[in-house]
Amino acid sequence: MVLTIYAPLFASSKRAVVTLVEKGVSFETVNVDLMKGEQRQPEYLAIQPFGKIPVLVDGDYKIFESRAIMRYIAEKYRSQGPDLLGKTIEERGQVEQWLDVEATSYHPPLLALTLNIVFAPLMGFPADEKVIKESEEKLAEVLDVYEAQLSKNEYLAGDFVSLADLAHLPFTEYLVGPIGKAHLIKDRKHVSAWWDKISSRAAWKEVSAKYSLPV
């Protein structure tokens, strides 16, 4: 049974997509047009009752939330491709810790920047300059912590690439691209080296080329 991932073009979904590609798992995609409200249609709500993206369908099994999907893929296909979860319980703890940091500390200010700088103009809404300023300041503080961590380890959870690193790829691509604030990455030596490593991985290059930003 081939896995199916919904809405592969959007950043949140690409967390799941890059995990599938890293693991060498075959999958199909189904586009969901958020601008047309397809995520609120009954057939989509039947598999994602909150009307959000992404969703992974694996036969009769359905799972949503991008980081949960990443964990599911990494566990189910642990024996193939790179081990993205860590080899010991201590390494796994670090992977989980930095996945949570990405979700709770890194992603919120970056999402605010994405919405105000990239999507607000497309949707005809004024950007909130106060939110932009505050979000950039918050993200800079988070990245200072990353700089300290990455001065000790090659990757966030240790000296191995993991889900914690991959989870950062899609929205950081916005940060260094259409958001226009690459200096937040480049001005930090160790963060910059880390970003160069993870963004140059073959799996991410494939995902970026095949599933281009919807803006």
Curated annotation (Swiss-Prot):
Keywords: Cytoplasm, Detoxification, Stress response, Transferase. The keyword Ribosomal protein does not apply. Residues 88-215 form the GST C-terminal domain. InterPro entries: Glutathione-S-Trfase_C-like, Glutathione-S-Trfase_C_sf, Glutathione_S-Trfase, Glutathione_S-Trfase_N, GST_C, GST_Phi_C, Thioredoxin-like_sf. Glutathione binds at A11, S12, Q39, R40, K52, I53, E65, S66. GO terms for cellular component: apoplast; chloroplast; cytoplasm; cytosol; peroxisome; plant-type cell wall; plant-type vacuole; plasma membrane. GO terms for molecular function: copper ion binding; glutathione binding; glutathione transferase activity. Residues 2-81 form the GST N-terminal domain. PROSITE patterns: GST_CTER, GST_NTER. In vitro, possesses glutathione S-transferase activity toward 1-chloro-2,4-dinitrobenzene (CDNB) and benzyl isothiocyanate (BITC). May be involved in the conjugation of reduced glutathione to a wide number of exogenous and endogenous hydrophobic electrophiles and have a detoxification role against certain herbicides. Interacts with BAK1. This is Glutathione S-transferase F10. The gene is GSTF10.
